[in-house]
Every structure is written in C-alpha cells, then in structure tokens.
C-alpha cells in the first residue's frame, strides 16, 4: 500500500480499515440490536455512524482518493463494493459493513452495477 497513488505525503495512510469497520459494526449492533442491514445506519449522512465511517477512510474515496478537502462531504456516498444485484435480493448480506466502502458520487455512479468476476 506504500506506493498507492491515493496516499500522499499530506495524508496519513490508513492501515486498520478492516478492524475499524468491525469496531463500528459492533457499536451499531450494541446500540441497535435489532438492526440487520448495517448499510441503513451508516448511509444516513447526518448520523454519527456516517461520520465515523468517513473517518475510517480518512474522508477519501476508496476508488479515486479524492478527499472532503477537495469536494464537499455531501458528494460522498456509502457504496456497496459488490453491487446489491449480485446478492440476489439478500439485502442483509449486501449491507454488511465488509461490503461497504466510502465513495465519491462520481466514482459510485461510474461503477453502477459493475459485477466482479471471481479470480
């Protein structure tokens, strides 16, 4: 990750994204034990969970690296890395935190329902 073009000398690279996402998921489950689709909690722009999720990604788009220093945080979205349609109607698994990334609106719209093939 050292040579990743999204990491600059001006930004601190994140190393524990997976662990930080798990911690946030645990917090949500403790505070909202009946919630099954984590996406619905994180996606609310004015929520504390959304703010924490953005901080996990250093307020950077996971795809292009643009930050909220350059464009408004209103132009960022929580994206399903593997598109919802790939889950055949299983919103619970599609909305799990390990399938969510922070994306700028431009990248999210360009990605649409891109389907990743298995390697």
Task: Walk through the language-model features, giving the residues of each.
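Internal, well-ordered alpha/beta segment that forms a basic, Gly-enriched binding/recognition surface
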Residues: 108
């Amino acid at each position: 990750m050292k040579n990743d073009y999204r990491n600059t000398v001006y930004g601190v690279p994140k190393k524990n994204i997976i662990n930080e996402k798990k911690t946030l998921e645990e917090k949500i489950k403790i505070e909202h034990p009946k919630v099954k689709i984590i996406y619905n909690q994180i996606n609310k722009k004015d929520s504390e969970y959304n703010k924490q999720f953005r901080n996990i990604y250093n307020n950077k788009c996971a795809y292009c690296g643009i930050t909220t220093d350059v464009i408004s945080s209103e132009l960022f979205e929580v994206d399903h890395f593997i598109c919802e349609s790939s889950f055949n109607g299983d919103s619970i698994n599609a909305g799990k935190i390990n399938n969510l990334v922070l994306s700028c609106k431009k990248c999210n719209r360009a990605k649409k329902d891109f389907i990743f093939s298995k390697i």
